[in-house]
């Protein structure tokens, strides 16, 4: 069996490019495979294929990532995103599939706090429907690998500055909470680009 190695991916937890493709099952050992194992371009996942099975391994921090995260397809039920600080414009994004439908609610404001989740929010909320792109939106969101991010990214050398928060609940009950202060995870720009792809302004 010929071993195909994809370009090395960035670890979504530590940002290292020293990653390897996970090869599951019982491949025939060849000199080509042994060379890739020695170079840590490939790691063996084991003869029993895990479900769900990650596709990549980080040689730096040991994190396995990629592939399907759930045994059955799961879609976003609720999403809350915030980025901002005491100075400049803050941004809020909210989605609640059961309460508001497949619609992204978005606010940009100089205010320090806006309850974007409330129907009575006293602000100008932009509504961006994504009902016809729902499956694609969920797929693109997962490709930001936020499930693999650390729970907190903190730069202790900056007191004020910019804070951000991402909370996502899936329809299978899984909830992911991520937070940062003046520090950002790998694939952060990819997340911002994903929101822009579905009709939101570019968040800087």
Predicted regions, residues:
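A composition-biased, non-transmembrane "mature-region" signal
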Residues: 2-7, 24, 28, 53-56, ...
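Short recognition patches in nucleic-acid-associated and regulatory proteins
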Residues: 9, 13-51
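Short Cys/His-rich metal-coordination motifs, predominantly Zn2+-binding knuckles/fingers
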Residues: 14, 59-62
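Short, surface-exposed linear segments at secondary-structure transitions and domain or protein termini
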Residues: 182-197
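N-terminal domain-start interaction segment
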Residues: 4, 9, 69-128, 152-179, ...
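Charged, amphipathic alpha-helical segments
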Residues: 130-155, 199-202
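Cys/His-rich microdomains that often coordinate metals
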Residues: 18, 64-65
